Amino acid sequence: MKSRPLHIAMYPWLAMGHQIAFLHLCNKLAIRGHKISFITPPKAQAKLEPFNLHPNSITFVTINVPHVEGLPPDAQTTADVTYPLQPQIMTAMDLTKDDIETLLTGLKPDLVFYDFTHWMPALAKRLGIKAVHYCTASSVMIGYTLTPARFHQGTDLMESDLMEPPEGYPDSSIKLQTHEARVFAAKRKDTFGSNVLFYDRQFIALNEADLLAYRTCREIEGPYMDYIGKQFNKPVVATGPVILDPPTLDLEEKFSTWLGGFEPGSVVYCCFGSECTLRPNQFLELVLGLELTGMPFLAAVKAPLGFETVESAMPEGFQERVKGRGFVYGGWVQQQLILAHPSVGCFITHCGSGSLSEALVNKCQLVLLPNVGDQILNARMMGTNLEVGVEVEKGDEDGMYTKESVCKAVSIVMDCENETSKRVRANHARIRELLLNKDLESSYVDSFCMRLQEIVEGI
């Protein structure tokens, strides 16, 4: 089969973690001669532009996000709202459907990549475009919660069902705690935009795709991808690790200067992504746990629920006690550059797939502190299956962590003489070496491009 340059449209979920993940894949596709039309709102585009390494091949196409009642006037992505308002962002994204159809009709791409827009496959089929579901969540998560073995539209998922993996699942050691299963079961009844149930939206998006793609490699998630392929009776491909190219900007001076004042590998960096808003009590336990380590730390976290700023949420006397060694910041940060800074030795992560991809190719040790959704099963895979990090202990019933449990996990991974730390460091180093193998990455992307050609040609 003779290959030709493809025209690919991208319309990811309006969360920066998803947007950046899609754009990193675009960079890999652009190197191989493919043309990309990346559909995104203006505020997201401004943040994405430094990550566009091939502007001659990757074009941003602006989409206006309609206002939905309950959202701030200028809300365009999940970074602009608290977690409870994310369904309204989804509703706003659904309301762009007609505009997307108009854009795709004019652009005439060969394929469209999507994730949360369950209506995309039907729209694409009507226009003669192939639909690729590009999943930034791990196949571990999708296999556990959304395959036909687990999921039936219109039926409830009970808490007891979710405590154990579904029949045929590749790893019986990956399980949910009581409080996690309770939340997953309750979410089965939750709508997520436009009065569509969250699980229905995700299941339809998967079930109606022409191709299912995962940002991973088979060396790490192969059995889970095979399981999903059998369950949905669809082709499932890995794009490879998609190692992030460095952004074109330098680290902001306030962070580079601050980090530069500490010894190599000594700083604990904590970040929970653009979507996570902690409850006040968990925010307090987190920052007090960081203080308790006695180590220098940089925490990039949003203000907790009910607070306008992180400064107003600080415990009394905290800022004075950690002055000179503690930096709590409430805005968006250049995480990729921070993780690569030589002073950073530990990363407390919420276990979002994007953050884990960035972390695994750096040398910082991982402390796993998942919050919601796929983060939980990502943490199990990283902590239990791959053993590349230590998960913060939480109460089985209430899911609460304490300052002591935060401090304990950090202390374990930062102690070079601890047996758990030795094992985690060795496993992390092995996977890092695997992921940084440029031949591995290149072969995956080449194979992925070939599969896209086959889908377009109907092979």
UniProtKB/Swiss-Prot annotation:
Coiled coil: none annotated. An anthocyanidin binds at residues 18, 373. InterPro entries: UDP-glycosyltransf_plant, UDP_glucos_trans, UDP_glycos_trans_CS. Expressed in leaves. Gene3D superfamilies: Glycogen Phosphorylase B. Disulfide bonds: none annotated. It is an enzyme of class 2 (transferase). Keywords: Glycosyltransferase, Transferase. It holds the Pfam family UDPGT. One of its GO terms (molecular function) is UDP-glucosyltransferase activity. It catalyses: a flavonol 3-O-beta-D-glucoside + UDP-alpha-D-glucose = a flavonol 3-O-beta-D-glucosyl-(1->2)-beta-D-glucoside + UDP + H(+). UDP-alpha-D-glucose binds at residues 136, 333, 335, 350, 355, 358, 374-375. PROSITE patterns: UDPGT. The active site is at residues 18, 115. Flavonol glycosides (FGs) with glucose at the 2''-position of glucose or galactose at the 3-position of kaempferol are present in cv. Nezumisaya and absent in cv. Harosoy, whereas FGs with glucose at the 6''-position of glucose or galactose at the 3''-position of kaempferol are present in cv. Harosoy and absent in cv. Nezumisaya. Flavonol 3-O-glucoside/galactoside (1->2) glucosyltransferase converting kaempferol 3-O-glucoside to kaempferol 3-O-sophoroside. Has a broad in vitro activity for kaempferol/quercetin 3-O-glucoside/galactoside derivatives, but cannot glucosylate kaempferol 3-O-rhamnosyl-(1->4)-[rhamnosyl-(1->6)- glucoside] and 3-O-rhamnosyl-(1->4)-[glucosyl-(1->6)-glucoside]. Has a higher preference for UDP-glucose than UDP-galactose, and no activity with UDP-arabinose and UDP-glucuronic acid. Represents probably a dominant allele of the gene. Belongs to the UDP-glycosyltransferase family. This is UDP-glycosyltransferase 79B30. It comes from Glycine max (Soybean).
